[in-house]
Amino acid sequence: MKLVIVSGRSGSGKSVALRVLEDLGYYCVDNLPLPLIGSLLEQLKGSNDLVAISVDVRNMPEQDKVLVQQLSNLPAGTEITSFFLNSSDKVLLKRYSETRRLHPLSKSRVSLQEAIKLEGKLLEPMSKLVDHYIDTSNLNIYDLSDQVRQILLGSVDKELVIYFESFGFKNGMPTEADFMFDVRFLPNPHWELALRPLTGLDEPVAEFLNRQPLVNKFIWQIENLLETWLPHLERNNRSYLTIAIGCTGGQHRSVYVAEQLAKRFSNGKHKVNVRHRELDNAKA
């Protein structure tokens, strides 16, 4: 079992790091007291091999030797990777002033500046024990995400899951779509009596549409558009992308186009899924 522990000063980006870990398939728990880590790992044994927790100053032991002892009591075979995120007092003060969030150590008689300094002092033992120390003072959330992925995977690349979904406009547009393409202007197999009862998954319909230059040109243009912008979407920390293709009934043209696009992007670079809303609903 792999365990990633994310600690650091409040406002330095722990929640960002935890979201990256969640995208990588880790079971994530925020602000878990260290004495409970062993119980958590026992509960998840056999169901989750990747676990990540974040701890803040309120859950940290005062003595570093207590911390070492707590970690040594974890189940045998636990592979631990630890991060400590930090930023300068000036940057943390600016971030808290902008978000107006309450600092974990803020009290009625303690100013924000004093709370930030106190937290840094309390977390100093932990900062000396971790595997990876990251100063986020000059990092944005994308830079930090890339660093965490680089450390864990050896690469900043993340797997973007692409969903191609066909649908019929007569039944409403899918609300989850990031891109939507209307193919109702393409030649319609519905008007071919022999093809009317079939779907875009059937070979006769596929052959009919493949013979249409307009269909092939439109598919090529969508492919080119997506190929151009996918790298930028990936760098923007997108985990998935839904591309909806709509025709009148969601039976012929949209199904065929969605299938063709899914095949073209199933090249190993991305995880691709295709679903046909109207066909699936008809089976239900």
Curated annotation (Swiss-Prot):
ATP-binding keyword on record: yes
- Keyword presence, ATP-binding: yes
Query: Which residues are ATP-binding?
Result: G8, R9, S10, G11, S12, G13, K14, S15
Annotated SUPFAM superfamilies: P-loop containing nucleoside triphosphate hydrolases
* Residues given in the record as GTP binding sites: D56, V57, R58, N59
Task: Enumerate the InterPro entries for this protein.
Answer: P-loop_NTPase, RapZ-like, RapZ-like_N, RapZ_C
Alphabetically, the GO molecular function entries are: ATP binding; GTP binding
Q: Which domain of life is it from?
A: Bacteria
- Per UniProt, which keywords does this protein have? ATP-binding, GTP-binding, Nucleotide-binding
Its annotated function is as follows: Displays ATPase and GTPase activities.
**Protein family:** Belongs to the RapZ-like family.
Entry protein name: Nucleotide-binding protein Sputcn32_0712
Q: Which organism is it from?
A: Shewanella putrefaciens (strain CN-32 / ATCC BAA-453)
